[in-house]
C-alpha cells in the first residue's frame, strides 16, 4: 500500500492542505450556525459574508481595480467560450483568437457559431510548442476583442508576458495559471478561469470583467447568459455553487498567508526549475515538448526516448505513489501539473524518481 501520494493531476488538482483542514473542521458547524456551509441559504448573512470575503480576497491578491467586477459563475471556462461571443461579438465586429492549443481551438469553435471570427496567430504548425511572437498578431480595426489562453495545459506552454493592445479589449482564459504570479489586471477587458486548477475545487468559474464592457443588456441573449444579469445581481441571480465559493475563499486565504501572488510566483518558479533542470540535464533521455522560451510554470510536459519507456516510467511512478503524470490523451507522453497547491517536496520527489529511472533504464 502506498504511504504517500504525490498529486500531479491536471484538474481537478491538488488543494492546499490548510484549506481542506479548515473545511473539515467547519463541515458540520459553520460559524456556530449548527449547519454545514452547504446547507446555508445563499440569501443568508452567513453565506453572503463568505461570498463577499472571497471577492475581497481575490481583489486584494490580484490588485483588481474598482472599475472591474468579480463574478462567480457556473459552467466552467467552456461556457465562457459561448458567453463571451454571445455578449460581445455583435454584427459588423470580429472575434479575434490566438491559437496556442486545444482550449483556444475550442473557444474559437464556439465563437464561429455566433459571428465572424479571425485567427490572429497560431502555433499549430509546430505542434503548439511555443507562444507566437506578438509582432505576428494580425489585428483588425473592427475586432470585438482579442482572445488568448494564457497557459496551455496539454502542451505545457505559457505566455511569459501579455500583448498591450488599444484597439479592442484583451480577453484571457486563465483557467490554469490565474494567481500563479502577479498580474496587471487593467491590461485586460476580461479574465475568466475555472477554479479547479489554482483556485479551488470544480464548480465555480471566476470572471473578472471591466464594468463598462459587459454591463449592458444584450438583445436576443437569454437572461442567464448575459454578463449584465450577474453583474447587476452580484452573482446571486440564481443559487451559486456555495460550497465551491467557500473553498475558493479558503484557498485565497491560504495564498494570502503565504505572502500573496509574488510569494506564490517565487515558489512556482522554484518548483518548475527542479523538473525542467532534470529534463535538460538528462542528455536527451527526457525531452520537453515546449520550447524553452514558452515553458509553462504550471504544466511540465515531456517524453522519454520511446513509447515503451514512457509506459514503463508511468508504471513505476504509479507504483511509488505519483498520481496524474500521464500526458493528455490527445498527445500522450508525460505531464507534471504543478499548480499552486502542489508542494515543492512533490517536485523534489519527482526529480529523484526521474534520475533513478534513467540510471536503471
UniProtKB/Swiss-Prot annotation:
<dbReference type="InterPro" id="IPR000192">
    <property type="entry name" value="Aminotrans_V_dom"/>
</dbReference>
<feature type="binding site">
    <location>
        <begin position="238"/>
        <end position="239"/>
    </location>
    <ligand>
        <name>pyridoxal 5'-phosphate</name>
    </ligand>
</feature>
<protein>
    <recommendedName>
        <fullName>Phosphoserine aminotransferase</fullName>
        <ecNumber>2.6.1.52</ecNumber>
    </recommendedName>
</protein>
<feature type="binding site">
    <location>
        <position position="43"/>
    </location>
    <ligand>
        <name>L-glutamate</name>
    </ligand>
</feature>
<keyword id="KW-0963">Cytoplasm</keyword>
<dbReference type="InterPro" id="IPR015421">
    <property type="entry name" value="PyrdxlP-dep_Trfase_major"/>
</dbReference>
<keyword id="KW-0718">Serine biosynthesis</keyword>
<feature type="binding site">
    <location>
        <position position="196"/>
    </location>
    <ligand>
        <name>pyridoxal 5'-phosphate</name>
    </ligand>
</feature>
<keyword id="KW-0808">Transferase</keyword>
<dbReference type="InterPro" id="IPR015424">
    <property type="entry name" value="PyrdxlP-dep_Trfase"/>
</dbReference>
<feature type="binding site">
    <location>
        <position position="103"/>
    </location>
    <ligand>
        <name>pyridoxal 5'-phosphate</name>
    </ligand>
</feature>
<dbReference type="InterPro" id="IPR020578">
    <property type="entry name" value="Aminotrans_V_PyrdxlP_BS"/>
</dbReference>
<keyword id="KW-0028">Amino-acid biosynthesis</keyword>
<dbReference type="GO" id="GO:0030170">
    <property type="term" value="F:pyridoxal phosphate binding"/>
</dbReference>
<feature type="modified residue" description="N6-(pyridoxal phosphate)lysine">
    <location>
        <position position="197"/>
    </location>
</feature>
<feature type="binding site">
    <location>
        <begin position="77"/>
        <end position="78"/>
    </location>
    <ligand>
        <name>pyridoxal 5'-phosphate</name>
    </ligand>
</feature>
<dbReference type="InterPro" id="IPR015422">
    <property type="entry name" value="PyrdxlP-dep_Trfase_small"/>
</dbReference>
<dbReference type="Pfam" id="PF00266">
    <property type="entry name" value="Aminotran_5"/>
</dbReference>
<comment type="subunit">
    <text>Homodimer.</text>
</comment>
<feature type="binding site">
    <location>
        <position position="173"/>
    </location>
    <ligand>
        <name>pyridoxal 5'-phosphate</name>
    </ligand>
</feature>
<comment type="pathway">
    <text>Amino-acid biosynthesis; L-serine biosynthesis; L-serine from 3-phospho-D-glycerate: step 2/3.</text>
</comment>
<comment type="similarity">
    <text>Belongs to the class-V pyridoxal-phosphate-dependent aminotransferase family. SerC subfamily.</text>
</comment>
<dbReference type="GO" id="GO:0005737">
    <property type="term" value="C:cytoplasm"/>
</dbReference>
<dbReference type="GO" id="GO:0004648">
    <property type="term" value="F:O-phospho-L-serine:2-oxoglutarate aminotransferase activity"/>
</dbReference>
<comment type="function">
    <text>Catalyzes the reversible conversion of 3-phosphohydroxypyruvate to phosphoserine and of 3-hydroxy-2-oxo-4-phosphonooxybutanoate to phosphohydroxythreonine.</text>
</comment>
<feature type="binding site">
    <location>
        <position position="153"/>
    </location>
    <ligand>
        <name>pyridoxal 5'-phosphate</name>
    </ligand>
</feature>
<keyword id="KW-0032">Aminotransferase</keyword>
<keyword id="KW-0663">Pyridoxal phosphate</keyword>
<dbReference type="InterPro" id="IPR022278">
    <property type="entry name" value="Pser_aminoTfrase"/>
</dbReference>
<dbReference type="GO" id="GO:0006564">
    <property type="term" value="P:L-serine biosynthetic process"/>
</dbReference>
Amino acid at each position: 500500500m502506498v504511504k504517500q501520494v504525490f498529486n500531479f493531476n491536471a484538474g481537478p488538482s491538488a488543494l492546499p492542505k490548510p484549506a481542506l483542514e479548515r473545511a473539515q473542521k467547519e463541515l458540520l458547524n459553520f460559524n456556530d450556525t449548527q449547519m454545514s456551509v452547504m446547507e446555508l441559504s445563499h440569501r443568508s448573512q452567513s453565506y453572503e459574508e463568505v461570498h463577499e470575503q472571497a471577492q475581497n480576497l481575490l481583489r486584494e491578491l490580484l490588485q483588481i481595480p474598482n472599475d472591474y467586477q468579480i463574478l462567480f459563475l457556473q459552467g466552467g471556462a467552456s461556457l465562457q467560450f459561448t458567453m463571451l461571443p454571445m455578449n460581445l461579438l455583435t454584427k459588423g465586429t470580429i472575434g479575434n483568437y490566438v491559437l496556442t492549443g486545444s482550449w483556444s481551438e475550442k473557444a474559437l469553435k464556439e465563437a464561429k457559431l455566433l459571428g465572424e471570427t479571425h485567427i490572429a496567430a497560431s502555433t499549430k504548425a509546430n505542434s503548439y510548442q511555443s507562444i507566437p511572437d506578438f509582432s505576428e498578431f494580425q489585428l483588425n480595426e473592427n475586432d470585438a476583442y482579442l482572445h488568448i489562453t494564457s497557459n496551455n495545459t496539454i502542451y505545457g506552454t505559457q505566455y511569459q508576458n501579455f500583448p498591450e493592445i488599444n484597439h479592442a479589449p484583451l480577453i484571457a482564459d486563465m483557467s490554469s495559471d490565474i494567481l500563479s504570479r502577479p498580474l496587471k489586471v487593467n491590461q485586460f477587458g476580461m479574465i475568466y478561469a475555472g477554479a479547479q486548477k489554482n483556485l479551488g475545487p470544480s464548480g465555480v468559474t471566476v470572471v473578472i470583467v471591466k464594468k463598462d464592457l459587459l454591463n449592458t443588456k444584450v438583445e436576443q441573449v437569454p437572461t442567464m447568459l448575459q454578463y449584465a444579469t450577474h453583474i447587476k445581481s452580484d452573482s446571486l441571480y440564481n443559487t451559486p455553487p456555495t460550497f465551491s465559493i467557500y473553498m475558493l475563499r479558503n484557498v485565497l486565504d491560504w495564498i494570502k498567508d503565504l505572502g500573496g501572488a509574488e510569494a506564490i510566483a517565487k515558489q512556482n518558479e522554484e518548483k518548475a526549475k527542479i523538473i525542467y533542470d532534470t529534463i535538460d540535464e538528462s542528455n536527451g533521455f527526457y525531452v520537453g515538448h515546449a520550447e524553452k522560451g514558452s515553458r509553462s510554470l504550471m504544466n511540465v510536459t515531456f517524453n522519454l526516448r520511446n513509447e515503451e519507456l514512457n509506459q514503463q516510467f508511468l508504471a513505476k511512478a504509479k507504483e511509488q505513489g505519483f498520481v496524474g503524470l500521464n500526458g493528455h490523451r490527445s498527445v500522450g507522453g508525460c505531464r507534471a501539473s504543478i499548480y499552486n497547491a502542489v508542494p515543492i517536496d512533490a517536485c523534489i520527489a519527482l526529480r529523484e524518481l526521474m534520475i533513478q529511472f534513467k540510471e536503471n533504464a
